[in-house]
């Protein structure tokens, strides 16, 4: 933990919170260490010590029920909702069926799907949480705009989405929801807050779509691996968990092969089943995790 020394957020608070978990942590305050150079030197020394300790850890087998997968999309095109997202959804269903967990978020890109999501809630209480979360995001985004007008609805998607063949925010939302598969939603999680009482299954995290921030939040909820879909090409990553990059666009995969880990385009180009591709994706997720 590195801080300047006079921020509104005291680095000591973050240090104390991490230490309470039992994880190794160190704190450096630039104004107390004698400047940036000395801070970096001391932090690098401690970081190397932490790395040496981590190198002694060994990977051990664990049950699939211990896995939590974060799902995210970015750089969406028409193939995302047809191939990549359904493949992720199939993988999510398999993880949840084995007692594992998964998270869907990006609520500002799910506007209009709230009834569908609420129908999959495990209880009326969870359904109400889903409605509340999405309606709150919609109120924030509205900002005086009338979303009954097409030109305003289209404010919620990028020029790249249009160029990739996505016709509207409705199509984007209906495609994005496929990442969650078909399992029931167990609860709505707050940002970076793990499920209570060790609950497992499919969850919705209450947060809007900012790639780095939303992924960080889902990792904070307990996700050990991220399934990230993109049709246009999005070379994203994260320092805290592996990000598996998935595309359903064979042209994008061919043009940016080094950026991708999984090609789901066989669903479109070769008629492969979503179930078949989802199984292959699950195998990759298990290897990575």
Regions found by a protein language model. Give the residues of each.
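Metallocofactor- and cofactor-centric catalytic cores in central/energy metabolism, strongly enriched
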Residues: 1-225, 229-289
